[in-house]
């Protein structure tokens, strides 16, 4: 399957946990975490997946990155194997990116994710625009989309999730940016941008990761 750009998705730990009963956010995780770096196609409904079943994830190949991966690409589900999130992302998406020199193996692929997280840090982008985690303040999707565009110059895809257990509120869940195969920023697909899962007419919430912050 052909693909022509990357989607780089970062997620807010509190909202990830609103979706999953067994969830734990380690003290070392204080901001937006990486969800994944996904080869994507603007002609297909989504990009290629599971491109090489004979290349399983091997933690030994990313050992130098593990301390950073735990902090910035964390698995928040204690009922799963420690490396299962990275295994899943590699098998489903990473194996589809190996044709590019910059992401041709596990070390390069996960290293690129960490590089992009440092360069396009969502916590920093939102803080620069006055959007801060808060127990009480709500934010509107239009303002948030415009804020991200002011920072990056391109349209991002912003997603929310409904927290039916605790707060009964819409929570900011994920922000995805799109990049060329040369890792230059581009606007994401207009259809995906407009079909946000965040409510258009009411605010969503962005609660802090650790209560003491």
Swiss-Prot record:
The record's listing under Pfam families reads: Ribonuclease_T2
Which pairs of positions does the record mark as disulfide bonds? 51-96, 160-198, 178-188
Organism superkingdom? Eukaryota
EC number assigned by the record: 3.1.27.-
pH profile:
Optimum pH is 5.0.
Q: Name one GO biological process term.
A: RNA catabolic process
Q: Could you confirm whether the keyword Nuclease appears in this record?
A: yes
GO cellular component terms given for this protein: extracellular region
Q: Name one GO molecular function term.
A: ribonuclease T2 activity
Q: Where in the cell is it found?
A: Secreted
Alphabetically ordered keywords of this record: Disulfide bond, Endonuclease, Glycoprotein, Hydrolase, Nuclease, Secreted
* Top-level EC class as recorded in UniProt: hydrolase
Q: Which residues are glycosylated?
A: 52, 121, 142
Q: What is its main location?
A: secreted
InterPro entries reported for this sequence: Ribonuclease_T2_eukaryotic, RNase_T2-like, RNase_T2-like_sf, RNase_T2_His_AS_1, RNase_T2_His_AS_2
Q: Where is the active site?
A: 35, 89, 93
Q: Which PANTHER family match?
A: RIBONUCLEASE T2
Q: What does this protein do?
A: Releases mononucleotides from RNA in the order of 3'-GMP, 3'-AMP and 3'-UMP.
Q: Which family does it belong to?
A: Belongs to the RNase T2 family.
Q: What is this protein called?
A: Ribonuclease Oy
Q: What is the source species?
A: Magallana gigas (Pacific oyster)
**Taxonomic lineage from the root:** Eukaryota, Metazoa, Spiralia, Lophotrochozoa, Mollusca
